[in-house]
UniProtKB/Swiss-Prot annotation:
Originating species: Chlamydia muridarum (strain MoPn / Nigg)
Sequence similarity: Belongs to the sugar phosphate cyclases superfamily. Dehydroquinate synthase family.
DNA damage as UniProt keyword: no
NCBIfam families found in the cross-reference section: aroB (TIGR01357)
Binding locations of Zn(2+): E180, H240, H256
Protein name per UniProt: 3-dehydroquinate synthase
Name of the top EC class for this enzyme: lyase
Residues that hold NAD(+) according to the record: 67-72, 101-105, 125-126, 138, 147
Subcellular location: Cytoplasm
UniProt EC number: 4.2.3.4
Cofactor(s) the record lists: NAD(+); Co(2+); Zn(2+)
InterPro entries: Dehydroquinate_synthase, DHQ_synth_AroB, DHQ_synth_fam, DHQS/DOIS_N, DHQS_C
Keyword Lipid metabolism: no
Gene, per the UniProt record: aroB
Length: 373
């Protein structure tokens, strides 16, 4: 079964199996398919795709890149360009990225720049990638530890989402993706929350598929209104302004989902402190929703996991200065939450200047709580 979730801003299909020949129906056999993945997924996920492509008469090439966030570098990017050039791959060939956010970010960026643009298909293998990284055409690489500093907007030709692939994920890694689901619920669609009430129910393919579809539609509807990230798309940065700063400081020792989880808690505290959030219980509800999936809700949780020395408040504030949204102020603007399911807007903008005083107080309070124990 192949189900079209939406075709805006680009097609996304929910599929029962990666062996389905129908997946390849729109691809021309005159050009090769270039599968790009890492060595773990080459064993776990790639075989059915390769087998099906070859049985249909496609010529295929496989390129393997290193695993993890540390692979999102110019070295990997240039390696792929050089491999494509060495193999004399024509620009009509389709690149097929098979992996989580890291693989898809790199493959999308290579596709957007090799021969000034090649078609590519995303085959996300993590929940984060299925409901977030594969949607909307943002791609890129890190510069040193600065997240996504070099990149482009380039939409995939298609996204093939196969929920059964997630059964090979460890539970904790699956939960990292739930952080982005909770983000979607809080900024735009509170009706996602009931699907998340019972973690055990997500072991059923039906419930999991429902969760994936609802999140894809939520993100796609936001991105479809603002591909270039000048307006409403900015609400998808909820939790990511502080989250990315923390990821940078922790240099790969915490997952994206964990960083975003704590980022959302801190940014909700900021929304309350600045009088933007209308519901005083919003923080309590958010923390409960995160804890249900064993997601961290404080800096203390992050440091306990990473086992690194505690940063100072000023180190966290200075990491924020690398944020791409930053203009002239000392702090980048933040996405704030008005109520569950509604990100705040201010004078037509979805990011608002933050009070240095309030943010410093919130960070210091969270850091001091660690010293008290």
């Amino acid at each position: 079964m192949i189900e079209l979730i939406t075709d805006k801003p680009h097609p996304m299909h929910l599929v029962d199996s990666l062996c389905d020949p129908q997946l390849f129906a729109t691809l021309a056999k005159t050009s090769p398919l270039i599968f790009i993945t890492n060595s773990t997924l080459e064993i776990l996920v790639l075989p059915p795709l390769l087998e099906t492509a070859r049985s249909l008469g496609f010529s295929v090439e496989i390129l393997i890149i290193p695993e993890g966030e540390q692979a999102k570098t110019e070295t990997t990017f240039l390696y792929l360009h050089k491999q494509l050039a060495t193999l004399t791959i024509p620009r009509q060939a389709t690149l097929i990225g098979v992996g989580g956010g890291v693989v898809l970010d790199i493959v999308g960026f290579v596709a957007s720049t090799h021969c000034r643009g090649m078609p590519f298909i995303a085959v996300p293998t993590t929940l984060v990638a299925m409901i977030d990284a594969s949607i909307g055409g943002k791609n890129g690489i890190n510069l040193d530890h600065i997240k996504n500093r070099i990149g482009s907007f380039y939409l995939p030709k298609d996204v093939w989402i196969c929920p059964s692939v997630l059964s090979s994920l460890p539970e904790q890694e699956f939960y990292h993706g739930i952080a982005e689901c909770i983000k979607h619920a809080y900024i735009a669609d509170a009706s996602i929350l009931p699907i998340l009430q019972n973690p055990a129910s997500l072991r059923s393919t039906k419930q999991l598929s429902l969760l994936i579809k609802r999140n894809c539609l939520c993100k796609a509807s936001i991105v479809g209104k603002d591909i270039r990230d000048h307006g409403i798309r900015q609400i998808l940065n909820f939790g990511h302004t502080l989250g990315h700063a923390l990821e940078m400081l922790f240099t790969g020792k915490i997952s994206h989902g964990f960083a975003i989880s704590v980022g959302m808690v801190l940014e909700t505290k900021l929304s309350l402190a600045m009088g933007v959030a209308r519901n005083p219980n919003i923080l309590h509800f958010l923390v409960q929703d995160l804890l249900r999936y064993q997601l961290p809700t404080s800096l203390k949780d992050l440091y306990a996991q990473a086992q690194i020395p505690i940063h100072s408040c000023s180190q966290i504030l200075s990491a924020l200065s690398y944020d791409k949204k930053k203009q002239n102020a000392s702090l980048p603007p933040f996405v704030m939450i008005e109520e569950i399911g509604l990100a705040a807007s201010c004078n037509g903008s979805f990011c608002q200047p933050a009070s240095n005083h309030f943010l410093t107080h919130i960070l210091k309070e969270d850091l001091h709580a660690m010293h008290d124990h």
